[in-house]
Amino acid sequence: RDSSTSRGLGDVYKRQLYNTGELARDLRQSGYEFSTTTDTEVILYAYMHYGVDFVQKLNGIFAFAIWDDSKKQLLLYRDRVGIKPLFYSFVSGQLLFASEPKALFCFPGFTPRVSMDGMREVLAIGPARTMGNGIFDDVNEVLPGHYLIFSKNTMSDHTYWDLFRAPHTDSYEQTVETVSFLLRDSVTRQMVSDVPVCTFLSGGIDSSIVTAIACRYMEKHGETLNTFSFDFKDNDIYFKSNAFQPERDLPYVRIMLDHYHTNPVSYTHLRA
């Protein structure tokens, strides 16, 4: 196959993909040859082979852009639930995009202006917000599960993934097995790393499940998981139960550390 360079394709990104190997294998079977081990080649070849909706095949968190010189199009992609941010704006007829608004502000001629609607949301429902709305005027957001296509005179917004609701018909046993598989698959895919892996263990259900799966995975590979936990100074004296947090976290952290062999690091005297 023609290389991505000869096809006039370019890619800038901020992403972590968890199925790069699977995609590369499928593309090799279709005749593509890789000259590097980076996921950039995988992304560009997948775009060439499957078209703009290739993003549906990606498993991971990402925000990236592809320039297709043959079509004179720029495509901006964002992951399904918006883990990686991606913003864009127009200044004097020029398209700007970045993973943070402050990068847009560095462009000559861009003047940041606070959005009153955005400020109302910050004060009323922060840290939550309406998807796509921010505190700056003229700073737009690529929505989760969307990609945008920009050409010389047009812009189009496409949804490639969305939540859907359907009646739950599985038995209790089937549900347990399905949820267990999805959790284990999600965590173990993300354990592949060239730097040490750790978890933030708060004592809640989410972090405890992630820690349990990660710990077992690392034990199978002869390694020990690093965990980090914290508690506030005098929290044992001043903690008050509420609907959001009926109990302190620290006792559950200790239960997890007693049950699983990890390298724990605890900060128990932080000031609020």
Can you describe what each PLM-predicted range is?
Residues 1, 7, 11-267:
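Cysteine-centered catalytic environments shared across enzyme families
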